[in-house]
A protein has these predicted regions:
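Helix-adjacent hinge/juxtasegments
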Residues: 68-101
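Outer-membrane beta-barrel transmembrane strands
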Residues: 28, 33-40, 51, 94, ...
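Outer-envelope beta-barrel architecture signal
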Residues: 44-46, 91, 100-102, 132, ...
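Membrane-embedded beta-strands of outer-membrane beta-barrel proteins
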Residues: 35-37, 93-95, 134-136, 145, ...
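Outer-membrane beta-barrel translocator domains and adjoining extracellular loop/strand segments
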Residues: 6-23, 59-72, 109-126, 150-166
Length: 182
């Protein structure tokens, strides 16, 4: 599989000592190559399946250096901070509707957004999210070619000190599969 994850996000830092909070927007695009394992069965003309990606898909990362203009501020948060987010062990339940050698597919994703950050005074947790996958593919003997688009739930994380991150992730993927027993 080869894919591209597009993530748009906003970080809103908390209000400190009457100073208005700061908002930072960012967009990240990450390409990935990987694989998955799947099992499927046929039922009433449909193909029903379960697909698991047994690795992390990186959503994005970033670094920033903060400096304060007044050494007398009550919260000195100078220095470099970094953060990274990934989708862990993406699991998809799907159905394919055959149209000759072609098929249309619909899938339901389940995954966890995991964060790894080095911040001044706080940390973010992780969040379970879901998503929908829309696919079109072609079966050719034991090979399957598929193009899919996935739209994930919005991500909303609040740090231990009240900062907030919101993000939206979408995925476009091409997948070549070998179907055993076809």
């Amino acid at each position: 599989m080869y894919g591209k994850v597009e993530t748009d996000g906003t970080e809103t830092e908390r209000t400190v000592s009457g100073v208005t909070s700061e908002t930072t927007n960012a967009s990240k695009s990450e390409n990935y190559i990987g694989g998955s394992v799947f099992a499927e069965t046929e039922y009433a003309g449909f193909t029903l399946g379960l697909d698991v990606v047994p690795f992390k898909i990186k959503l994005g990362d970033g670094k920033r250096t903060d400096t304060t203009s007044d050494a007398n501020e009550s919260t000195q948060e100078d220095g470099t901070v970094s953060a990274e987010a990934s989708l862990d062990y993406l699991t998809t339940i799907y159905a394919h509707y055959p149209i000759g050698d072609w098929y249309a597919g619909l899938g339901y994703h389940m995954t966890k957004v995991t964060t790894d950050e080095k911040l001044h005074t706080s940390s973010y947790g992780n969040q379970d999210i879901n998503g929908l996958q829309y696919a079109i593919g072609k079966n050719s003997g034991s090979l399957r070619y598929e193009l899919s688009y996935s739209d994930f739930d919005d991500i909303s994380l609040t740090s231990s000190n009240g900062d907030k991150i919101t993000a939206d992730a979408d995925n476009l993927m091409f997948k070549l599969s070998y179907v055993y027993g076809q």
